[in-house]
Amino acid sequence: EVTPIYGAVGFESRYVDFLSPKWMEMLNYTSSTAAKLGMGMDMNTGTGWPFGGPQIKTADAATKLIVQTYKLNAGEIVKEAIRVNDPKQQGIAVLQALVAYDEKGNATDLMSKVDAAGNLNMQPVTSKTEVYAAFSGKTLQKVKRAAPGGEGFTLDHLSKSATDAYLARFT
């Protein structure tokens, strides 16, 4: 099995970037030598853990749920714009759901009341209410112990487009 991982310290001048022409030449040599010896050969399509790399852009990177809660008393509204608080997620995370729950557990979907700037056009609540904002954010995790040339974001393993983007470099 050929599994490309991080390079050995002290041998940086001998690193060969993953899937570069030189790397492919070396893989070809390994494969043909194995065949001559009557051996099979397998190659892992990952470098390090988990799968990802330079071809994975932010849109296809591993995703996570971010939940923010706004607690309101009777007569109040959410005054601030509904935006993700984490500075690392600003400009990345996308609001997916906005739901208010009153004291009795009744739910009200507020998504249609949020404008493009995140301003919420709502009436004051009549009882204690909790508003939950659910954002689709990114883990921003990078491939750990990536082979030279394999560094980059971890892919969203549940996304067809991310998987297609990842596998495209092998076709």
Regions found by a protein language model. Give the residues of each.
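Aromatic-lined carbohydrate-binding/catalytic grooves of carbohydrate-active enzymes
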Residues: E1-M24
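Mature extracytoplasmic enzyme cores
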Residues: D17-T171
